[in-house]
Amino acid sequence: MARMDRDAMIAAISTVLAATPDPEGTSDLVAERGHINVAATAAELKGAVQRLAPLRGYRWIVINAGDLFTAGPATLGTKVGILDPTGRVLKAADLPRAK
C-alpha cells in the first residue's frame, strides 16, 4: 500500500470505521471503537499518543503501516492501540486502569 497523507488517512479510516470528527476536539475522530488520532508521519506519533493519554475508553492511533516499528515503542505502556488506514489492528488497545 502506498504511503498516505493525513487527509487521505482520515478519509479512509472515517469510511472504514464510520468515524466522525470529535465534537470536543480532544482527538481527531471518534468511532464505536473509541477515540482516534491520525499520525501520518513518524514525527506526529509522540504528539498523537500524548493527546490520547488523558482520555477514557479505548484509544487508537492510525499510522501508515511502514511506521509500525516507530509507533510500537511510542505506545508502550500507554494502552493505546495502533490501526492502519484500512482499519486493520496492528496493536490491540486496552482500557486504562482505574486510578
Name these PLM-found stretches.
Residues 39-85:
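Catalytic cores of nucleic-acid endonucleases
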Residues 30-40:
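Short, basic, glycine/proline-bearing loop/turn elements
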Residues 1-30:
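Acidic-basic catalytic patches of nuclease active cores, encompassing PD-(D/E)XK
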Residues 78-99:
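Charged, structured surface patches that assemble and position nucleic-acid processing machinery
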Residues 28-31, 92-94:
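Short, solvent-exposed polar/charged micro-motifs at secondary-structure junctions
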